[in-house]
């Protein structure tokens, strides 16, 4: 029977996802069959499974670290915020409906059986299941009906390790405070704590570790130094967008990406960020398009019509249209592709009130949103002669796009379908495929077409090497044998 160990945090973004990914690789390298599991995740950064479901992108990275295929059971409840209608609720990989916050609280007890079913399925095929909590373990106001943290741990009888982030300050208060506010039955499941992202001389925090252990009664399981290479791994959620990569003054290619309120699948940017000669600039509200832009890239959105309205409200559409008139290159991915067209119709009110929105008009295509969601892994070849390279990726969208420019498609897919559209000039293009920038040949061809340096990077190989180094980093600062002994 498989063992399981759960990692909860004192708050969001304390490093739970990365720690689970690193431990998944470390225990896998020891010969164990490892499966990652997160009962409930909230993110618009999702990955497609082979059977046409979807899970959080963090669990996809953890599965990769464990060297196993993605499964919808690794993240049985995925919440995808989508504007005025609340959040789309995805259960075991399939859309279950939409709910606003208050309604979802009432829905949670009915979702626990799905969560436990998925957990049991993973345990049946693994030696060790590494469970990640969500947000903070100490949100006692949300404890009733909880399925993400202690509610799940109690229901599944899984021991817990609590993670605190010293980099943001107040880690002693965060950990001791967590013990103070949770009830005794929940606290009984906690076996120890880890202090994450430490910088400096570890001996200077020895008394801090002792104080936390004394105040909580939990075992001090490790002080993990900051892992600077984390930026080489795909980001989990939109918090990463608040800390964009450092400027690259010597970059040969500058790609500008408007950051809109309901941005999704922003991990499409990671392979571009990893290019030494490419600077990906995030364009925030009230900012204008820089004059040295080589490509405007509109990425995915969970509320396309609302984000299109936000783009226009900021006046950034004027910059984009002027840039295109001057011969600039513009590319749209999924929701960004839909925005580039002439109209987006939502007759069924998928994104709220039924309406028709006028797009940017840079592509002669029209989109009709529909309730059916397309989730599929794809491969294909870009048809732009300047790029003409193979790629792989995935589709994740609700809607159909057609029109004159779709007769000059962006790509032909391996199943024979045509995807996307290109303008008559070839300088404006759109595609429904996410993840294509991770394909080295395609990325290199695109950068060359923009007049930049063709890529010499091997992105996927770099992710694998970084996971190996993360595993070694954790193995050097955590007792893996002790952690395994705590699992049950």
UniProtKB/Swiss-Prot annotation:
Record's keyword terms, sorted: Cobalamin biosynthesis, Glutamine amidotransferase
Gene3D superfamilies: 3.40.50.880, P-loop containing nucleotide triphosphate hydrolases
Catalytic site positions: 334 (nucleophile), 434
Keyword Repressor: no
Protein name stated in the entry: Cobyric acid synthase
Residues in GATase cobBQ-type domain copies: 252-442
GO terms of molecular function: ABC-type vitamin B12 transporter activity; catalytic activity
GO biological process: one example: cobalamin biosynthetic process
UniProt pathway annotation: Cofactor biosynthesis; adenosylcobalamin biosynthesis
InterPro entries cross-referenced by the UniProt entry: Class_I_gatase-like, CobQ/CobB/MinD/ParA_Nub-bd_dom, CobQ_GATase1, CobQ_synth, GATase_3, P-loop_NTPase
One Pfam family, short name: CbiA
Function: Catalyzes amidations at positions B, D, E, and G on adenosylcobyrinic A,C-diamide. NH(2) groups are provided by glutamine, and one molecule of ATP is hydrogenolyzed for each amidation.
Cited PROSITE patterns: GATASE_COBBQ (PS51274)
PANTHER family attached to this UniProt entry: COBYRIC ACID SYNTHASE, DETHIOBIOTIN SYNTHETASE
Keyword Nucleotidyltransferase annotated: no
Family: Belongs to the CobB/CobQ family. CobQ subfamily.
NCBIfam families named in the record: cobQ, PRK00784.1
């Amino acid at each position: 029977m498989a063992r399981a160990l759960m990692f909860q945090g004192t708050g969001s973004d304390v490093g739970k996802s990365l720690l689970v990914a690193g431990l998944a690789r470390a225990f896998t390298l020891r010969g164990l069959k490892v499966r990652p599991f997160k009962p409930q995740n909230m993110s618009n950064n999702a990955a497609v499974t082979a059977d046409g479901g979807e899970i959080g992108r963090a669990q996809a990275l953890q599965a990769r670290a464990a060297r196993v295929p993605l499964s919808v059971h690794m993240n049985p409840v995925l919440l995808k915020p989508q504007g005025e209608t609340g959040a789309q609720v995805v259960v075991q990989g399939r859309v279950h409906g939409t709910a606003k916050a208050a309604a979802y609280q009432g829905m949670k007890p009915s979702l626990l059986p799905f969560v436990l079913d998925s957990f049991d399925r993973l345990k049946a095929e693994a030696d060790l299941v590494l469970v990640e909590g969500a947000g903070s373990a100490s949100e006692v106001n949300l404890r009733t009906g909880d399925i993400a943290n202690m509610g799940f741990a109690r229901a599944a009888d899984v021991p817990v390790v609590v993670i605190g982030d010293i980099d943001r300050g107040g880690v002693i208060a965060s950990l001791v405070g967590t013990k103070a506010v949770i009830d005794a039955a929940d606290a009984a499941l906690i076996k120890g704590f880890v202090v994450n992202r430490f910088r400096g001389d570890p001996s200077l925090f020895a008394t801090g570790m002792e104080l936390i252990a004394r105040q909580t009664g939990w075992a001090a399981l490790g002080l993990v130094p900051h892992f600077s290479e984390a930026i080489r791994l795909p980001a989990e959620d939109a918090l990463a967008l608040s800390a964009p990569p450092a400027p690259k003054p010597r970059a040969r290619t500058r790609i500008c990406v408007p950051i809109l309120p309901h941005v999704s699948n922003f991990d499409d940017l990671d392979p571009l960020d990893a290019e030494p000669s490419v600077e990906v600039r995030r364009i925030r509200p009230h900012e204008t398009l820089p004059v040295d832009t080589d490509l405007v890239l509109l990425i995915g959105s969970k509320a396309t019509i609302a984000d299109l309205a936000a783009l226009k409200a900021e006046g950034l559409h004027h910059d984009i249209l002027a840039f295109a008139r001057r011969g600039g290159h513009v590319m749209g991915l999924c929701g960004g592709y839909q925005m580039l067209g002439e109209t987006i119709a939502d007759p069924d009110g998928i994104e709220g009130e039924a309406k028709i929105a006028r797009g940017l008009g840079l592509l002669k295509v029209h989109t009709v949103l529909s309730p059916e969601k397309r989730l599929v892994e794809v491969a294909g070849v870009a048809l732009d002669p300047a790029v003409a390279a193979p790629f792989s990726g995935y589709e994740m969208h609700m809607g159909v796009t057609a029109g004159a420019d779709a007769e000059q498609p962006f790509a032909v897919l391996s199943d024979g379908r045509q995807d996307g559209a290109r303008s008559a000039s070839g300088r404006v293009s759109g595609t429904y495929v996410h993840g294509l920038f991770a394909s080295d040949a395609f990325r290199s061809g695109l950068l060359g077409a923009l007049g930049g340096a063709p890529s010499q990077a091997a992105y996927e190989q770099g992710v694998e090497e970084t996971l190996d180094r993360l595993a070694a980093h954790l193995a050097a600062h955590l007792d893996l044998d002790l952690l395994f002994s705590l699992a049950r």
